Amino acid sequence: MAELSANYNYLENEPKWQDDWQKKNIYQWNSTLPKDKTFIVDPPPPTVSGDLHIGHAMSFIQLDCIVRYQRMLGKNIFFPIGFDDNGLPTERFVEKIKNVRASNIARPDFIKMCQEVVIAKEGEFCKFLNAIGLSVDWSLKYQTISSLSCKISQMSFLDLVNKNQVYRNHQPVLWDCIDQTALSQADVEDKERITSMYYIAFAVMNSELKVQIATTRPEMLPACCAIFFNPNDIRYQHLHNQFAITPLFKSVVPILAEETVDINKGSGLVMCCTFGDTKDVAWWRKHNLPTRIIIDYYGKVKPLDFTVSSQNQEKFTEYYNQITGLKIAQARNKVVELLHHNQLIIKQEQISQTVKQAERSGAILEIIMAPQWFIKVVEHKDALLQKSQELEWYPKSMKIKLDNWINSLAWDWCISRQRYFGIPFPVWYSKREGEEGKIIFADISQLPVDPLYDLPAGYSKDEVIPDSDVMDTWATSSLSPQLSSHGISSNLTIDSTRHNQLFPADLRSQAHEIIRTWTFYTIVKSYLHQNSLPWSKIMISGWCLADDRKKMSKSKGNIILPTELIKRYGADAVRYWALTSQLGHDCVVSEQVIGIGKKLVNKLWNAARFILQHITGKLTAEFLISAKHCVEKKVISCTTDLWMLSKLQDTVNNTSNLLNNYEYASARLYVEEFFLKDFCDNYLELVKSRIYDHSSEYQKSAIYSVFWGLKTILELFAPFVPFITEELYAAIYQSNNLCNGSIHSSNKWPLAQNFYNDELILTTGNLAINILTLVRKSKSARKLSVKAPISLLQVKYDSDSYQQLPSDLVDDLKLVTNSNEFSIVTNFTTIDDLITGDGITVNIVYPGSMKHEC
């Protein structure tokens, strides 16, 4: 039998097991087993937009703990890993590290550059995920930019076209002037800023009246198409259906009632421009207002290309020409200057304002008109809320985030992006005479296609215009369950057998900040394609916080790379930290907690070394059979051993229940407390003397119990700290041919019914632990060694109840406390040190101490 070294070398052992698990295909999915025997997970494909940090490690480790548990239960595991390596986030990353702008180089050259970067970065990602002990099946790896993913994503698009759930329209879109692309509602975040509110004088047509309109965007005056007031605002009811004259530009615009106008904001009158914000869009649609677009794709005032009803067309053109070509902020300053010059600004005040900002570039968004592809979501809000209700949420509190997002939806999902490195739309536009502008869709049999290089059947190159846009990256990553199943729905697949085996999945794991994107879009796609949920359960992790308690993110530059932490403490210690955070709760990176994890790993090693030292020469097949028989057939003879096995049964039972509900943090704590307190601090101390004593009739009971207890502890810890548990399991059990396979193999989870359980034994054993605790407290107070002798140890119950302890338990207590005599009494005779706790009083008489008679 191999001996364990004095210290555990994680730097040597962790890479060893990473290689071993892969070589032996420990985590391989078995495609021959049916769906009901398989646990299918849909993990987040990391975005190739920078380094993976400790926050990614936290989320993946939490999922991996659940996956390892399910595998040990006996489930066939489908645990893929994907990389979201297309779209705007990846493009921005490539632009940054290559110091280029995609718009300034040839499209093929930029795409090639992106491909080279993602291949290198994904190699780093794989090393990272291996280092933290992720139990994925690497043969299931996918990339969202791959040919297969492109085919599946384009299949999804065409299926939604056929189901009339996709449309193309020239309509208002959220526009990022930095990245030069349309964005969806989910790509946007709110930004608070201080700005100026200008109260501007408008004339009322055919009247001497002047009205004030408050706006933060005076540069939009030439795009003004109406004035609104709340119909309940008595100040302006007399103006209904009259006309206002815009300052400077002298446009004639109607004054209309609109119940969504905030009476208390500004003057209560508001101008509607095309388009200053999303309210303008809603009012423009509702009231069928004219369109006057003045902002171009670059965030500048475009040349005048529309006509308006102005009382002075010459002045309109004169003032407009003064702002043409200016950036928005410059145009605003110029219009304010002109308004001041004409004494049209009544007052100006500083306000706090919330504006829409691009999540990636940070650009303040504009709203422009552009032809884009959209997926219908607004009309499905009720159905999507029902799907949210059907989904099992862990924790339940996260459901409201999705519900609130669905309820807030005002726009359909814009999936067009005016970028380069993404999934192309399988679309062309006809130039053929008589069908100019006709949309031509690829046939599914052609997929994947790139319309820039491929042609639709029956058309020549000169007869079509390719759609040069690419899809929103979420349009593909939202298909992550289908990217694994190789099918869109049961009626549209690449591999129908595989799709039916894997779709829908069992569990989605992700962080809460992408509920409005990845969760929502995946549910949308699954609902529209197959009228089902993509998975039955979803577990949501919290944020990983930096030392300043701010969310850790690549964009904020406050990330902590786990490489140094793993080198300093080991991957198991980092996993320990990640599994201290309750599901859905934010977790601060704490080297102190990681250090506690390292101490736990060392404690496991040292406990195993101690046990091994005392069963040397006994580890034979017969020994294993005898130990298994004695434990599982409940024929262990000593009370202390039975108490430990009863506590172990409780631990197995409670840990299983907690992990079944994805409460990994509570499960880890339960196992840890049993190991440290019950097993190491108390049980091993109680039985240590019996293990040493070869003449004791109870030695075999102790050795069998210790041996089986350690094996079970390693199995319970395996989902949490896989490297140390595998090392010890291999050294003690595999190397002696006592167990087959990895501890992380199928059917290695302990069964609660295989352990002794007796409430009386538990009560009796707990009493013994209470006595031991009080003795330790007494010796500590007297600054005595734990081995200090005791002449007389007496126990008196505080209540009328009276219970003698079994003689074998008394023997263990006397040995561990080094007591000459032990008794349970109703009254003390000689008193030395009285100490009380948990329903009992203990009298401890030390040799040579001052004592008195009662």
From Swiss-Prot:
Residue window of motif 'HIGH' region: 46-56
Taxonomic superkingdom: Bacteria
Keywords from the named record: Aminoacyl-tRNA synthetase, ATP-binding, Cytoplasm, Ligase, Nucleotide-binding, Protein biosynthesis
Binding site for ATP: 554
GO CC annotation: cytosol
Motif annotated as 'KMSKS' region, chain positions: 551-555
SUPFAM superfamilies per UniProt: Anticodon-binding domain of a subclass of class I aminoacyl-tRNA synthetases, Nucleotidylyl transferase, ValRS/IleRS/LeuRS editing domain
Molecular functions (GO terms): aminoacyl-tRNA deacylase activity; ATP binding; valine-tRNA ligase activity
Catalysed reaction, written as an equation: tRNA(Val) + L-valine + ATP = L-valyl-tRNA(Val) + AMP + diphosphate
Main location: cytoplasm
Swiss-Prot/TrEMBL GO biological process terms: valyl-tRNA aminoacylation
Enzyme class, broadest EC rank: ligase
EC number: 6.1.1.9
Location(s), subcellular: Cytoplasm
NCBIfam families: PRK13208.1, valS
Oligomeric and partner information: Monomer.
Alphabetized PANTHER family for the sequence: VALINE--TRNA LIGASE, CHLOROPLASTIC_MITOCHONDRIAL 2 (PTHR11946:SF93), VALYL-TRNA SYNTHETASES (PTHR11946)
HAMAP family reported in the protein's UniProt record: Val_tRNA_synth_type2
Domain remark from Swiss-Prot or TrEMBL: ValRS has two distinct active sites: one for aminoacylation and one for editing. The misactivated threonine is translocated from the active site to the editing site.
Function text: Catalyzes the attachment of valine to tRNA(Val). As ValRS can inadvertently accommodate and process structurally similar amino acids such as threonine, to avoid such errors, it has a 'posttransfer' editing activity that hydrolyzes mischarged Thr-tRNA(Val) in a tRNA-dependent manner.
Family affiliation: Belongs to the class-I aminoacyl-tRNA synthetase family. ValS type 2 subfamily.
The name this protein goes by in its record: Valine--tRNA ligase
Gene that encodes it: valS
